């Protein structure tokens, strides 16, 4: 699945570059974006006594756009995001931070109305490997936060054809399973996570 996504992204980048060569009625744009990534997580802890709190992080990446007759657009992106989840278990006397590194490829359809663009589409997760350290300092895999395919929707504004301001929300269609283990040699506890996020990014278009 992930190999197919990589091939799809490569084809989209190639199509964008080709369209930039002079296809009538089609305009391309490239840019870089960066900003705030705020996770909105719902944790179903089951029998676990732990408490989890997702903290705000950052997001940055590459923005591409294929604008058709100035109104409709196809907008593939490559976005990396990073944030931490605070893990606290008073009963087990254990505290740590789960470090979340995520690489996603939104493939959005964009509709322009004046200065505003309305964007919606699927998001493909290529990398999602949250980890934390157990009592002995060993790295433990928490398990992925997003399913392979999730969604994103939002609005963006392009000013002076160079400055892009983008706000969006996104998340998974279903919960994923994660594992809490304070000792890598012991069996862990399983919880369910439904992950959403909100992002506010500013970009420069070329």
Predicted features, each with a name:
Residues 60-62, 105-107, 151-153, 167, ...:
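Membrane-embedded beta-strands of outer-membrane beta-barrel proteins
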Residues 32-38, 76-80, 120-124, 153, ...:
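Transmembrane beta-barrel strands of outer-membrane/channel proteins
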Residues 64-66, 109-113, 157-159, 204:
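Residue-level signature of outer-membrane beta-barrel architecture
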Residues 71-74, 115-118, 161-165:
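Repeated loop/turn-to-beta-strand initiation elements of outer-membrane beta-barrel proteins
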Residues 33, 157, 161, 192-206:
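Outer-membrane beta-barrel "beta-signal"
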Residues 5-8, 12-33, 206:
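Outer-membrane beta-barrel biogenesis signature
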Residues 40-52, 82-101, 128-147, 175-193:
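Flexible, solvent-exposed loop segments that connect beta-strands
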Residues 26-28, 52-58, 99-103, 114, ...:
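Residues that define the transmembrane beta-barrel architecture of outer-membrane proteins
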